[in-house]
């Protein structure tokens, strides 16, 4: 999923739903589509695809009658460029062996496109979704094929931890295969500068603060941080706070937070913000804070620990940061010039808890070709093709760790597959209005940490409206 388009994607998804439920007319539809950023022609095409507000039909989602014979798979996804090339490499042996054609359609607004196609009775055979929340919605509507109706579940349970199976299930059935994952329990550093400074990677939060203080006391800046990301500014801080919350409170409380079963004014949420503030607040940790944090792009901030001389020593963000580093510093050697250490333990009850994300494979039609492709994509051998090419972390425990192209990628995959507790990033699972408010709240907190109570009260007002609407 392209992180930078999450806001537009969700807005279009809501617009399509509102139109189909006759909450808005054609004129309002066009006005909102243009406001989101669509061109007039694109908005007109989307309106036409909605079919004048046709309601969702029940789709081909049952497996009781057996699969329909087919030799093609229409697959809707978000992969372009190197990701598309790698997926083509994965499917090449499958196509050759099974004589099945895969028609892959790429879209930047997958949720809106898929919703529109379903409403127009033109659903693809399969789709790669951005998060399990959308999968749960489609499963509840009866739009998806239960994968456990044809997968070897004994093998699946051997390959995937129960946490991944739970995330992919609805009402006791498996509807989603988690495929290309992201590990957000990673703090990035330069081993050479750590060695030169006599620094040890910390394993607990108190150790992390002690290390940060030690670096700051030497007249250097221990951290880099950038929260700027155009309309989505603030999401890196939301990732920080989600990881902190899970590490402090565990999965059960995290789930309550995401579902708004506890208010945003709950002390546990305030504590998570304040813990994040131990890093973000105060000019002694981050050069130019707080303004530099707010104005610096998240990718630009990732470079600072790896400059010569270093402009910082640590940077937090998901394992996709490796791509930022190697893209900027072409000669950087994984494990030598850059590495990560696992997010440190805050509460010993939840050691090893990590947040992350993953692309979600779902089936919308029950055909022999779909069943064959899903079975193939679920195998470790198929996933290892992409793993070896780089840029792919698999939650499949049976994928050979030796297949990863370098020690850093291997370590991230190992951390992900062996995580004692795993949860998707909290903001990705929240209603759009709450997600947007969360991002904004993190920016306000960095700017004015003394206003935290007011910020959380405002968050609670937004959540109270969004979860009941």
Model-inferred region functions:
Residues 92, 96-97, 317-321, 327-392:
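Extracytoplasmic/periplasmic substrate-recognition and gating elements
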Residues 175-179, 209-262:
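Extracytoplasmic/periplasmic solute-binding protein
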Residues 132-185, 209, 215, 236, ...:
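Hinge/lid segment of periplasmic solute-binding proteins
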Residues 116-117, 124-125, 156-192, 222, ...:
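A structural signal for short loop-to-beta-strand junctions that line the ligand-binding cleft
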Residues 93-160, 167-169, 192-203, 304-306, ...:
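Extracytoplasmic "Venus flytrap"/periplasmic binding protein-like
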Residues 212-213, 258-293:
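Glycine-centered hinge/linker elements that transmit conformational signals in sensory
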Residues 1-28, 40-45:
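N-terminal secretory signal peptides
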Residues 195, 414-469:
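Conserved C-terminal helix/tail region of periplasmic/extracytoplasmic solute-binding proteins
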